[in-house]
């Protein structure tokens, strides 16, 4: 019910090696249920402790709270997506999207396990992307590029996920 929470289990334990092995971090976790497979797909930023080896990793599970199996890095055109700040969005038609800092919006494959195409590139964007859709309009939210420091948050709108995207300004008080 998103109000009463209880700990059930660690759903993706540290791996013995690889992108989530020892001396690596996994963060910014997002989970979507894939309509074509019925599986839950978890995405995360995986990196070394110095934040110099980023990957978007993914894991799958048949239940939302079961033990996920790390599948590896998410691939686009046969290469790992080496980014860090990301979000996800599932459209009303069931298509899944990976939202990346600095502008790329990647459309996921039907099974959500790889990137199919770059659906849009939002120029002059920021970090910590989040998207929602209301009354047929897409809204993309960002914060400025200041890492963990406080900053202003702004948004773009588009009538279609592929654009055109228009910067609208701040969505909360300045400062």
Enumerate the predicted regions with their spans.
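Carbohydrate-active catalytic/glycan-binding domains of CAZyme proteins
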Residues: 1-175
